[in-house]
Amino acid sequence: MALSDPLGDLLTRIRNGQHARKDSVVSPASKLRVRVLDVLAREGYIRGYTEAKLGNHDALRIELKYFEGQPAIHHLARVSKPGRRIYSGSRELPRVRNGLGITIVSTPKGVLSDAEARDQNVGGEVLAEVF
C-alpha cells in the first residue's frame, strides 16, 4: 500500500521510537527522507543513520539520541501537509521557540534548516519543525 505522506510517516516513526525509548528505528528509504535526516543529524537531533537492505527494499536505520535519559527531540511536527502546502520566503521563515528549535525547509538549493536557508537567502516549502 502506498503512503500518502512518506515524510509524515518518517517523523511519526522517530517520535514513536523516542517515546518508547528505542535506540533506533527503521524506515523505508527515499531521497527526501535522507535529506531530512541529514539536517536532523547536522543539527544534533539524531546520532545518525545508515542505509540498509531489507529484503528487496532499501531502508534507513535511524539512531535516536538521548540526553540524560530524555529524548533530544521534544517536539517533531509536520507543517506543510499533502492537503495543505505551506511556503515561505527567506525573510518570513518561522522561528521555532525563538530560535531554540529548527524549521526544516525544502528549497531549490536542497533541504535546509531555517538558519541555513536564511543565510543563503532562499525560501521554500516548510516541511517540519523540531525542538
Curated annotation (Swiss-Prot):
Q: Which UniProt keywords apply?
A: Ribonucleoprotein, Ribosomal protein, RNA-binding, rRNA-binding
Asked if the Swiss-Prot or TrEMBL record annotates the protein with the keyword Nucleotide-binding, the reply is no
| CC terms in the record's Gene Ontology section | ribonucleoprotein complex; ribosome
The superkingdom listed in its UniProt entry is Bacteria
Gene Ontology biological-process annotations: translation
Single GO molecular function: rRNA binding
Q: Which Gene3D superfamilies did the record assign?
A: 3.30.1370.30, 3.30.1490.10
Q: How does it assemble?
A: Part of the 30S ribosomal subunit. Contacts proteins S5 and S12.
Q: What does this protein do?
A: One of the primary rRNA binding proteins, it binds directly to 16S rRNA central domain where it helps coordinate assembly of the platform of the 30S subunit.
Q: Which family does it belong to?
A: Belongs to the universal ribosomal protein uS8 family.
- What is the protein's given name? Small ribosomal subunit protein uS8
UniProt source species: Zymomonas mobilis subsp. mobilis (strain ATCC 31821 / ZM4 / CP4)
Q: What is the organism lineage in this UniProt record? A: Bacteria, Pseudomonadati, Pseudomonadota, Alphaproteobacteria, Sphingomonadales
The gene name on file is rpsH
